Amino acid sequence: NRVVENNFMIEGAENAASARKDNPIPLYGGQKDSPIKHIVFISKENRTYDEVFGQVEKGEGDPSIARYGYNASFYNKNRTVGIENATIMSNHLKLASEFAIADNFYVDSDVSADGHRWLVNTYPNEWVETVTAASYGGNRSYNPASKAPGSLAMTGSAGAIYPEDYNEAGSMWEHLNRNGIDFFNFGFSVMFEPGFYDDSYKYTGIKHFANFPLPAALFERTSKQFPTYNMSIPDQFRVSQFIKEFNSRWGEGKDPLPQVVTVILPNDHGADERPGYGYPFRESYMVDND
């Protein structure tokens, strides 16, 4: 009954307008001028609200699963080294305590692969919805030793553009461009994966994953110096590159800041422990991202 009630609950527009009459943000496009002139959209990775913010009192979270929040204890895989009572993502929590925070997000995606599509306003088609679910369930995977002619590995993350289900009208990039909204992109939709070095390719050499062309509007407004998804690259380096290019492009007043700036900081995805490179725990990636 609750699901049916929620799905078919209709509230008059006048109620929403009345409740938000003192809100400076327009209720809908064209209602009034918005005080927001610039948006910096930062995309992150596979963390849930509760994992980081479950202990935040002003949010509706579950503190019992806030493994990257306050007073966390963790160990390496071999349980030979550990840390007790640490606050892992302290900057995230500080921002949440001092500024606005939103909870109860109900996303359209099931996993990361289709989530990156929704992120840039591309609707996954039937092929994607079935193949990604089968892949994540362990029942369908890419075979790097396949003998199929022209076999390529079409993988993706970082809000990439996928030819198999790209909207006829494009994604948010074309939408911004059509409506005269200036934007600039750091890291979205650009990803070159490493190659396969299996000895079965002794007659051909390395077999590479394939990338695909970016839409013109996005290519022209994308940084060529900002690193995309790769857990071997620290987010600290990404931020340094962002600051450097931000200052050179707009910080010195040469050009006006675009209305929309998109940035990807993906290392909260996590990866295997790399103690020799400063990542002795999986939590180390979260701290780097923080």
Each language-model region and where it sits:
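N-terminal pro-sequences and low-complexity stem/linker regions of secreted or lumenal proteins
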Residues: 2-290
